[in-house]
């Protein structure tokens, strides 16, 4: 290590997040994934030797305490100003713009929408407006910077924001494992004048608890509230990451499968517009996501389809690609446009083949139904 390197530290590595329960016993610890929004693109803290930065969060309301230790700090006459760690982090650790409600947010009496068990442990998902949960939300804003690529603060004074909090629970403790924020947009509908489009915005499962099924539990619980609310007409996702897209595909596909959508007589490669519209209204998915789930379903049984049915699937995917990229594609000449669409189809199909390896297979159609489907595709 050079003399200069001793004074330079990667912020992601030297910042440690520690959660403690209400008895101040350590619950878990982890590091942020991103700090560029706080310390710049290089994610570097400069001017200290043997630096350790610990942010201790006390559950259940995630009240933070910042501790900084080092063996030596650059002298004022060195000509280089060390990073103001405390001043910089304190800017983000608490959102002071929010009007914290007078009553404390009580996790024990908050609206619980789903409970489940995993590895002998109990988990609970709570639902609240960000105003109701202002006491915890003022401390969670920084987590969108730590764990979401391109994440940013949301307006916690806007009553249209909802938050869903995932806790691991015992008789005495509630320890945070993840959270999701949802914004309720107005959506016009001729039958429902105060219709809502729900948009999933921030979705975070804390690092020690990822890849354990908690993301699917949280997503499915949230979607369940959408489906039960007659004012919510559909729901979408804001700037989803690749990992979240994968989670979403798996959850939405399995939900449609359990609803029997893929077993209906009208579900065949030549889907009618009337059937698609009715199922979009029923599932509250966007047209793009519903089409994607249907395409995944056809891919799971592609080998069992006739040549004519496979062609219908292929043309359906290409038509969707064309519609989604209409403005760009219309600027190309016909031959180049056809090539672009075909290449996009090949990439999409390769992605589907990887996804369906982890999806449950559809039940094979009876010979009588297969004959009917083949005839309807001709």
Curated annotation (Swiss-Prot):
Superkingdom classification of source: Eukaryota
Pfam families linked: Acetyltransf_1, HAT1_C_fung, Hat1_N
Keywords: Acyltransferase, Chromatin regulator, Cytoplasm, DNA damage, DNA repair, Nucleus, Transferase
Enzyme class: transferase
Coiled-coil portions: none
Active-site feature positions: 238 (proton donor/acceptor)
Annotated protein name in UniProt: Histone acetyltransferase type B catalytic subunit
Organism: Schizosaccharomyces pombe (strain 972 / ATCC 24843) (Fission yeast)
